[in-house]
From Swiss-Prot:
Pfam families: Pep_deformylase (PF01327). Its EC number is 3.5.1.88. This is Peptide deformylase. It catalyses: N-terminal N-formyl-L-methionyl-[peptide] + H2O = N-terminal L-methionyl-[peptide] + formate. Gene3D superfamilies: Peptide deformylase. The gene is def. Its cofactor is Fe(2+). Coiled coil: none annotated. It comes from Rickettsia typhi (strain ATCC VR-144 / Wilmington). GO terms for biological process: translation. Removes the formyl group from the N-terminal Met of newly synthesized proteins. Requires at least a dipeptide for an efficient rate of reaction. N-terminal L-methionine is a prerequisite for activity but the enzyme has broad specificity at other positions. The keyword Nucleotide-binding does not apply. Signal peptide: none annotated. Keywords: Hydrolase, Iron, Metal-binding, Protein biosynthesis.
Amino acid sequence: MSIYSIVTAPDERLKQKSKPVLECTDQTRKFMHDMLETMYNANGAGLAAVQVGVLQRILVIDIKAHDPVERPKDFYPLFIVNPEIIEQSTELVTANEGCISLPEQRIEVMRPESVKIRYLDYHGKSQELKANDWLARVIQHEYDHLEGKLMVDYLSNLKRDVVLRKLKKLKNNIV
């Protein structure tokens, strides 16, 4: 297993739209496992491939410890390839979010309370998943990464600029 470096804002790769995966191969599955290890290492709930510098439509999610919904034992981790949001609720919920690509930042984001996605699973089989509450939020957050959107994009221009300046300063102090 490999642990990748996390791409952090204001890196321009995070603003690019990811490309579909053409086929789920053994190499794709190994990459997903490496993404999962990287996510665990960073104490994340989800990770999009772009966050490790790969512009492919792949997400990994594991919120087992925080999911209020009782799920089958083998439900997590979720390996999600080429997701599409096919339904979303009209009810919006605001909650505080963090992101491993935006270190030390917490932002209130309003999102649909539930979503339904269509995607390819670990084996490349088409699946649909209806999610609400915390899982829906994590899916939408990670999906945004595939679209080149960050949680700061939900802020006003002024607030977004303040956060991005903080991140740039933080990044310069680390390097």
